UniProtKB/Swiss-Prot annotation:
PROSITE patterns attached to this UniProt entry: RRM
Major site of localization recorded for this protein: nucleus
Task of the protein: Plays a role in alternative splice site selection during pre-mRNA splicing. Represses the splicing of MAPT/Tau exon 10.
SUPFAM superfamilies in the record: RNA-binding domain, RBD
GO CC, alphabetical: nuclear speck
Domain of life: Eukaryota
Keywords: mRNA processing, mRNA splicing, Nucleus, Phosphoprotein, Repeat, Repressor, RNA-binding
Record region (Disordered): 72-95, 169-489
Localization, UniProt: Nucleus speckle
RRM domain location: 2-72, 104-177
Record field: compositional bias (Basic and acidic residues): 247-279, 293-332, 357-370, 394-426
Annotated S-S bridges: none
Name listed for the protein in its UniProt record: Serine/arginine-rich splicing factor 4
Length: 489
């Protein structure tokens, strides 16, 4: 039965759409849709010819399709006269999933550099169904073709070996499991894979190292608060400064140490950058000979974006930690100033209290000393007045009656003054007026005694008072010494 091939078929096309597209040209027996292409089987050959003639290049589900007669036997991968191959090109491995690998492999040598794997696959379809094709991957000017069956591979080896493709005669060699060619090809393939793996591992290591250093960097910066310097300054400056600050660091505080740490880390960061650049250059130079250079560039751009985002987050966290540390330092300074002011006020109060107590003790001792001086001056005046009165009495012995009255009046006045003095002086000076009272009682009780005996009694009382006055002065002198000792203390 005649079959029609449909190329450039839209992925959205269904069997109903294809049936509608070919409706009116004849009876359709079967519609077989593949990825990007399909087959339609007609009942009559003339209907198939009409469909191919009129529908080639028409739109089907938004795509301009290719409609041709199907070449080769139906549902069979055997060789035919060859197809146009355009639809099969579109159904390559880059769009329709991974190809199936088989052991029926041929090595194509002396392949033209203009011949792609798609061209090679289309050319090899003359011999049979091709499952996998590759060109210039392991080695330049060399390709690989894999077939579904061993018979297809043998047919291609017999029929297509020595034919010309793009002006070059190709040479087909069977790739056996024990052959040198397979070994060398697999070696070269594994070598290229290991290269790419080592590249990726180097990159990942350098990235992880740089991320670790950046984490520790953020910690040291949050401690010290000198984080904006190492970023804003150039790398060469940070290197020279790190050398200077290393020599200065033992004499300075923790701040200088953290500053010397941060340039060291910036130096390590710049080294990481330089290593990454060298590795990227190496990988770019190697990727020129291989195909996956786009993947490397994409991964680089992604890693740069991630680094930029991480640096932004770190800067925000550093600013927050700086503000927190500043507020903590301010609160500490405030509490210290408060405690200092409190201690100062307490010490001032203590000093004032001590000064007051000293002033009070001094004033007390002064008042005591002044009182004792006054009392001693009063006593001296009393003694002198009593001695003068006794002299006057001796002179006036001849006139007894007037002298008695005068002496009595004087004694009364002295007694009154003595009582006043005794009241003012207190308990320590109370026994002073006793001899005066005794002398008064003796003088009053013996009015008939002659004047000589009276004068003797008066003189005896004077001697008594004199003898008692030194004892008073002796009793006052220890009180003065006590007051002086108080004032000294």
């Amino acid at each position: 039965m005649p079959r029609v091939y449909i190329g450039r078929l839209s992925y959205q096309a269904r069997e109903r759409d294809v049936e509608r597209f070919f409706k009116g040209y004849g009876k359709i027996l079967e519609v077989d849709l593949k990825n990007g292409y399909g087959f339609v089987e007609f009942d009559d050959l003339r209907d198939a010819d009409d469909a191919v003639y009129e529908l080639n290049g028409k739109d089907l589900c938004g795509e301009r399709v290719i409609v041709e007669h199907a070449r080769g036997p139906r549902r069979d991968g055997s060789y035919g006269s060859g197809r146009s191959g355009y639809g099969y090109r579109r159904s390559g491995r880059d769009k329709y999933g991974p190809p199936t690998r088989t052991e029926y492999r041929l090595i194509v040598e002396n392949l033209s550099s203009r011949c792609s794997w798609q061209d090679l696959k289309d050319y090899m379809r003359q011999a049979g169904e091709v499952t996998y094709a590759d060109a210039h991957k392991g080695r330049k000017n060399e390709g690989v073709i894999e077939f579904v069956s061993y018979s297809d591979m043998k047919r291609a080896l017999e029929k297509l070996d020595g034919t010309e493709v793009n002006g070059r005669k190709i040479r087909l060699v069977e790739d056996k499991p024990g052959s040198r060619r397979r070994r060398s090809y697999s070696r070269s393939r594994s070598h290229s894979r290991s290269r790419s793996r080592s590249r990726h591992s180097r990159k990942s290591r350098s990235r992880s190292g740089s991320s670790k250093s950046s984490h520790s960097k953020s910690r040291s910066r949050s401690r010290s608060g000198s984080h904006s310097r190492s970023k804003s300054r150039s790398r060469s400056q940070s290197r020279s400064r790190s050398k200077k600050e290393k020599s200065r660091s033992p004499s300075k505080d923790n701040k200088s140490r953290s500053r010397s740490r941060s340039p060291d880390k910036s130096r390590s960061k710049s080294k990481d950058h330089a290593e990454d650049k060298l590795q990227n250059n190496d990988s770019a130079g190697k990727a020129k000979s291989h195909s996956p250079s786009r993947h490397d560039s994409k991964s680089r751009s992604r890693s740069q974006e991630r680094r930029a985002e991480e640096e932004r987050r770190r800067s925000v966290s550093r600013a927050r930690s700086q503000e927190k540390s500043r507020s903590q330092e301010k609160s500490l300074l405030k509490s210290r100033s408060r405690s200092r002011s409190r201690s100062r006020s307490r010490s001032k109060d203590k000093r004032k209290g001590r000064k007051r107590s000293r002033d009070e003790s001094r004033s007390r001792s002064r008042s005591k000393s002044e009182r004792s001086r006054k009392h001693s001056s009063k006593r001296d005046s009393k003694v002198s007045s009593s001695s003068s009165s006794s002299k006057k009495k001796k002179d006036t012995d001849h006139s007894r009656s007037p002298s008695r009255s005068v002496s009595k009046e004087r004694e009364h006045a002295k007694a009154e003054s003595g009582q006043r003095g005794s009241r003012a002086e207190g308990e320590s000076e109370a026994p002073n007026p006793e001899p005066r009272a005794r002398s008064r009682s003796t003088s009053k009780s013996k009015p008939n005694v002659p004047a000589e005996s009276r004068s003797r009694s008066k003189s005896a009382s004077k001697t008594r008072s004199r003898s008692k006055s030194p004892s008073r002065s002796a009793s006052r002198s220890p009180s003065r010494s006590r007051s002086r000792s108080h004032s000294r203390s």
